[in-house]
Amino acid sequence: LTEELRTFPINAQGDTAVLSLKEIKKGQQVFNAACAQCHALGVTRTNPDVNLSPEALALATPPRDNIAALVDYIKNPTTYDGFVEISELHPSLKSSDIFPKMRNISEDDLYNVAGYILLQPKVRGEQWG
């Protein structure tokens, strides 16, 4: 994976960071362990209308198309329109008592998972989301 492919927006202001191959690999491992059951290939099993494609992430409220926004969502998930907190329905750090797979996820893991999610459309194209 080239540095260009591993460069992602880290915030809404457009600042970027390059994730290492190790960070991408760790993000993949955590995604596969904690997220892929419902989000394999970027699809949302419980709601196919909302997926992890760049377009869907950008159109969410607030937009979830950067690392900080995805990390925030994993900590405190809300509906696509941003109005309703859904941590009892969607795995998150806030609901780790209900969703045990979230219990041992670190801040670094969240960062790496977000990078992994943002990488997938670059390498999988239309097969993601």
Curated annotation (Swiss-Prot):
One of its GO terms (biological process) is respiratory electron transport chain. It is a peripheral membrane protein. The keyword Lipid metabolism does not apply. It holds the Pfam family Cytochrom_C550. Heme c binds at C35, C38, H39, H90. Disulfide bonds: none annotated. Binds 1 heme c group covalently per subunit. One of its GO terms (cellular component) is plasma membrane-derived thylakoid membrane. Its main location: membrane. InterPro entries: Cyt_c-like_dom, Cyt_c-like_dom_sf, Cytochrom_C550, PsbV_cyt_c550, PsbV_cyt_c550-like. HAMAP family: PSII_Cyt550. One of the extrinsic, lumenal subunits of photosystem II (PSII). PSII is a light-driven water plastoquinone oxidoreductase, using light energy to abstract electrons from H(2)O, generating a proton gradient subsequently used for ATP formation. The extrinsic proteins stabilize the structure of photosystem II oxygen-evolving complex (OEC), the ion environment of oxygen evolution and protect the OEC against heat-induced inactivation. Low-potential cytochrome c that plays a role in the OEC of PSII. This is Photosystem II extrinsic protein V. It comes from Limnospira maxima (Arthrospira maxima). The lineage of its organism: Bacteria, Bacillati, Cyanobacteriota, Cyanophyceae, Oscillatoriophycideae. The gene is psbV.
